[in-house]
């Protein structure tokens, strides 16, 4: 190799190698500090863009889950009201059956009639109050409710099941006035009870479907989050090992540069003396 005091090829090469090591070391330290192998678009534009889109989809599913959970609660309230209503109908049937006994005296009959009418009014209140966040599937105020099903805005629709008096074949004045009408009311209440249980069965089916879809959305979100992690997260164990290797390489590079920088002094020493 030609020795010169004007240029020092060895020092230039050592400096280039050291700069390269420092750049790689800074990148490795950045990955360790952020935990990301792709922290921004300049790291890897295609991967960064893909990860951003997947992350946005996963984030938007939070709104879907919130909507579906509101749907769950709305159905649960309607089902709870339905349980109360079927219990009330059972008691109303008992009162009507007892009142159909022609051997009753007037006082006993009137007491049964009053109990029946009180149960009837309670039934209407149960249906009217079956609201979650001001929304009801049981009071007859709507025919269906739609909740978010996916991040594209598609819906999961639940058909309302009216459990108020009119929804199950009764009225606000349904009652009996004597043993004969009480006997007729037994059949009416039996039909109402069957109607109510059928409607509750439909709500139950909707509840199962909504729960299943909510579970799916949760799993989908977890999968998307994991996919984003696979795209951009750094392997910290690997990066830590690489960091130690680069730090050693950096130290050797500094020493190599120091040695190379001594070459001109060696040349000058040849002229001494």
Curated annotation (Swiss-Prot):
One of its GO terms (molecular function) is structural molecule activity. It comes from Caulobacter vibrioides (strain ATCC 19089 / CIP 103742 / CB 15) (Caulobacter crescentus). Flagellin is the subunit protein which polymerizes to form the filaments of bacterial flagella. Belongs to the bacterial flagellin family. In C.crescentus, the flagellar filament is composed of multiple flagellins of 29 kDa; 27 kDa and 25 kDa. Keywords: Bacterial flagellum, Secreted. This is Flagellin FljL. It comes from the Bacteria. It is found in: Secreted; Bacterial flagellum. One of its GO terms (cellular component) is bacterial-type flagellum. Gene3D superfamilies: f41 fragment of flagellin, N-terminal domain. InterPro entries: Flagellin (IPR001492), Flagellin_C (IPR046358), Flagellin_N (IPR001029). SUPFAM superfamilies: Phase 1 flagellin. It holds the Pfam family Flagellin_N.
């Amino acid at each position: 190799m030609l020795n010169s005091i004007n240029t020092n090829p060895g020092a230039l090469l050592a400096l280039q190698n050291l700069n390269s090591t420092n750049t790689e070391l800074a990148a490795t330290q950045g990955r360790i500090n952020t935990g990301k192998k792709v922290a921004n678009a300049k790291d890897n534009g295609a991967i960064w863009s893909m990860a951003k889109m997947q992350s946005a989809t996963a984030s938007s599913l939070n709104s879907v889950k919130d909507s579906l959970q509101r749907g769950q609660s709305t159905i649960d309230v309607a089902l709870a009201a339905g349980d109360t209503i079927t219990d009330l109908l059972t008691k109303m049937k008992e009162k009507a059956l007892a009142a159909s006994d022609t051997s009753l005296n007037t006082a006993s009959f009137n007491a049964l009639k009053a109990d029946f009418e009180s149960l009837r009014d309670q039934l209407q209140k149960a249906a009217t109050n079956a609201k979650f966040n001001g929304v009801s599937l049981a009071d007859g105020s709507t025919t269906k409710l739609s909740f978010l099903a996916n991040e594209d805005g598609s819906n999961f629709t639940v058909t309302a099941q009216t459990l108020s008096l009119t929804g199950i074949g009764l009225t606000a004045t349904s009652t009996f006035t004597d043993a004969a009408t009480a006997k007729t009311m037994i059949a009416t209440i039996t039909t109402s009870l069957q109607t109510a249980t059928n409607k509750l069965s439909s709500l139950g089916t909707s509840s199962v479907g909504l729960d299943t879809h909510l579970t799916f959305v949760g799993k989908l979100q977890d999968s998307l989050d994991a996919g984003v992690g696979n795209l951009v997260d750094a392997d910290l164990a690997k990066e830590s090992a690489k960091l130690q290797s680069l730090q050693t390489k950096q130290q050797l590079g500094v020493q190599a540069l120091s040695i190379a920088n001594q070459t001109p002094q060696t040349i000058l020493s040849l002229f001494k003396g």
